[in-house]
């Protein structure tokens, strides 16, 4: 129960950092310190199933083609729309234009295809669902997947799987460590409102605001689940690795 409560508090902290109306932005701290009860093995969300990694990075640093609203429904995130055939065997995604990665490069179909095909290799359940089929580039802003059978749960997996179908630039996929199979920490590069700036193992993780973030959704509406307009009003989020529950609680109560 304590762990679930702590995860909820982390999620609420992130929502506060991202979703306050602009009129209140002047009241934001430059840095928010967050105590995390553990660290991810890698923060590579294609392979890592830890709650810590997902809570920290999903929707903040890393984004997906589609994501989940609060009611569990699926909504576009890095795509502006998508088509699914009546028999759920053909999927086409139309990407948002002008989305930038944290390395300054614009996201295109090549990045999405490289990311999702690597995700399939990492995530056995999704790989079994699609068989030998793989995502392909149609043009710079269109991606498709065509199967010889129905895959009715594919969108749900793309939006909400524990091994998240996040989108990296091609360079991150090419940099995968041959020994560990992980994307190196220096290549945890996404499209979200925060950048993965530093990981001091067993000490802290530092996220910093990405000023070129391409927001989507209505700025006058609150975030709906993981979907909606996000703006990083707080410049820095610092996650301290504090495994002792009493120490975390005391830090919360003291305002640290």
Pin down the residues of each PLM region:
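Positively charged n-region of N-terminal signal peptides that target proteins for export
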Residues: 1-5
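Bacterial N-terminal signal peptides
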Residues: 10-17
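Sec-dependent signal peptide cleavage junction
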Residues: 18-28
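Short, well-ordered beta-strand elements
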Residues: 28-39, 80, 90-93, 112-115, ...
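N-terminal lobe/hinge region of extracytoplasmic solute-binding protein
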Residues: 35-86, 117, 189
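Aromatic- and charge-enriched surface segment that lines or borders ligand/interaction sites
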Residues: 80-125, 138, 144, 248-253
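Surface-exposed binding/hinge segments that line
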Residues: 83, 127-175, 193-200
């Amino acid at each position: 129960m304590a762990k679930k409560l702590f995860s909820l508090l982390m999620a609420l902290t992130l929502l506060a950092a991202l979703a306050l109306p602009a009129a209140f932005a002047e009241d934001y701290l430059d840095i928010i310190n967050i105590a995390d009860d553990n660290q991810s093995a890698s923060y590579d969300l294609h392979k890592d199933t830890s709650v810590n990694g997902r809570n920290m990075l999903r929707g903040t640093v890393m984004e997906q083609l589609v994501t989940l609203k609060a009611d569990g429904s699926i909504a576009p995130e890095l795509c502006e729309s998508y088509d699914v055939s009546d028999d759920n065997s053909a999927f086409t995604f139309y990407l948002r234009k002008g989305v930038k990665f944290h390395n300054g490069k614009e996201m295109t179909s090549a990045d999405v295809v490289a990311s999702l095909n690597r995700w399939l290799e990492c995530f056995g359940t999704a790989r079994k669902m699609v068989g030998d089929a793989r995502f392909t580039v149609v043009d710079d802003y269109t991606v498709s997947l065509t199967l010889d059978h129905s895959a009715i749960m594919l969108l749900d997996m793309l939006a909400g799987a524990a091994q998240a179908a996040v989108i990296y630039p091609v360079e991150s996929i090419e940099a995968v460590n041959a020994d560990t199979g992980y994307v190196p920490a220096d290549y945890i590069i996404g499209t979200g409102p925060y950048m993965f700036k530093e990981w001091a193992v067993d000490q802290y993780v530092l996220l910093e605001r990405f000023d070129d973030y391409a927001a989507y959704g209505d700025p006058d509406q609150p975030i709906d689940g993981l979907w909606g307009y996000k703006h990083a009003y707080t410049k820095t989020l610092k996650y301290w690795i504090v495994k002792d529950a009493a120490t975390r609680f005391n830090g919360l109560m003291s305002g640290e």
